[in-house]
Amino acid sequence: YPTQGVSVTSDTGLVEWGTLAAQGADFAYIRAARGASLRDPLFAANWRGARGAGMRYGAALDYSLCAKAVDQATQFMTTVPRDNAALPPVIRLGFDPSCSPRPGRDQVLSELNTLVNLVESHAGKPALLNISADFDAQYDIASGINRTLWVDGNFFAPDYAKRPWVMWTASDMRHIDGVDGSIRWDVVAP
């Protein structure tokens, strides 16, 4: 996979962006927010760091079934600056153990359509959907919302999405210079 990069959150810790870029990371997706209640405390520093290292960079929102789409979009829009150089935004869809509600598919698709429209309007470009296998199995998002897909699967290319994927988190535990601990390593389909 010739184009590879990383996903970071405040949980990743401090990142040495120049070192990370030298290790082969072409791009970075940086978590801006989780749901409507958490603004990632390292978002601004990571955004500046990735840009300063000459990497392509984009913002990610971790979707929550426990918050309204409008509130999550507001959190994203007040955190992420409008930036024509930024990569398309990504909305991560997975189950959060601290959020127990599991609404029906129609309600989830309705909320996601609202969220996608608001995030895309702010970013000025179509969003990617990073869908976990269990979330897609329950809600069949890949069939319900026509957006570029990003899937997850350690080491082996996943086949759970009903449409071809464009991005894949190939490892959520890669160790690389420039980061203490593990990092999510992402690849783009050739």
Where are the predicted features?
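Hydrophobic anchor at the start of a short beta-strand
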Residues: 57, 126-127, 149
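Structural recognition of alpha->loop->beta junctions
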Residues: 75-97, 139-165
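Functionally critical loop-and-helix segments that line ligand-binding/catalytic clefts
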Residues: 1-8, 12-13, 144-190
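Flexible, glycine-rich phosphate/dinucleotide-binding loops
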Residues: 36-37, 66, 136, 158, ...
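Alpha-helix initiation/capping motif
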Residues: 40, 104, 131-132, 141, ...
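Aromatic-lined carbohydrate-recognition surfaces of secreted/lumenal glycan-active proteins
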Residues: 124-137
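Substrate-binding cleft of extracellular glycoside hydrolase catalytic domains
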Residues: 1-22, 26-122
